[in-house]
Amino acid sequence: MNILLTGHKGFIGSSLLKALELNHTVTGIDLLDGKDLLTCEFPNTKFDLVIHLAGRSGVRESINDPSAYWMNNVEASRRLFERYEDTRIMYASSSSAYEPDLNPYAASKYVLEELASRYSNTLGMRFHTVYSNTPRKNMFFDRLLNNKLEYVTTHYRDFVHLFDIINAINILIEATYVNGVLDIGSGKTVKIQDLVSNLPILMSTPTERQYTCANIEKMKVLGYEPKYFIKEFLTNSKKGTIIKLNTGEIA
């Protein structure tokens, strides 16, 4: 396939790019290349598929700058959807969309899903909490792996490994008859406090979801089965093992 991938230099996009290039021709658009989806000229190319991962993430930053999240997650997506209205589009959403009234980030993802529902060619991928060996800097999982957490919260989260996300996307690429919005996660929830001990406990804030757990039954019908789970991953990380991208094996 000839695929357009937005956000190809991001946390998920950079790994997805490597996986896609094994079997497809991929063109990337990313803000790090100076290509802002709000203003850039789109490639004058016929694509078989658009995978839209670009956008802003993070609850706390969205509270400080809600307009940026609206512009980057909603208006930029609107422009992309209109440009490629005759092309199949798979786009990244978030489990935060379940409770859009909690914060601007959640609201932007909810509106994104509502916007996409107006187009018959779209498929939403509602990612839950994604982690990997190389997490985003200064985010929760980065601090956890590097023993820099100062406290834990009372939240419950469905943690899904980056490579399970990549596998799910590859499955959905082939499932050309699927549309709507699908949950992508591990299908299991974990109490944050159970991941690390002997740290102060911070009560949950009203701007974040207390509990998340992906309903992956529809994904399982398509052949998706998560391979990695957070507690086993942390145990392997302490042993110095590394999960390889292309093989999914632990070395």
Task: Report the location of each language-model feature.
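N-terminal Rossmann NAD(P)H-binding glycine-rich loop of SDR-like oxidoreductase domains
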Residues: 3-22
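SDR active-site strand-loop-helix element
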Residues: 6, 29, 50-54, 89-95, ...
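Adenosine-cofactor binding site in Rossmann-like domains, unifying the SAM/SAH pocket
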Residues: 25-42
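NAD(P)H-binding glycine-rich loop region in Rossmannoid oxidoreductase-like domains
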Residues: 41-72, 96-99
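NAD(P)-cofactor binding segment of oxidoreductase domains
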Residues: 50, 64-90, 114-115
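Conserved Rossmann-fold NAD(P)-dependent oxidoreductase catalytic core, especially the SDR/UDP-sugar
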Residues: 78-106, 123
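NAD(P)-dependent short-chain dehydrogenase/reductase
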Residues: 102-106, 110, 114-166
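C-terminal substrate-binding subdomain of Rossmann-fold SDR/epimerase-dehydratase oxidoreductases
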Residues: 151-251
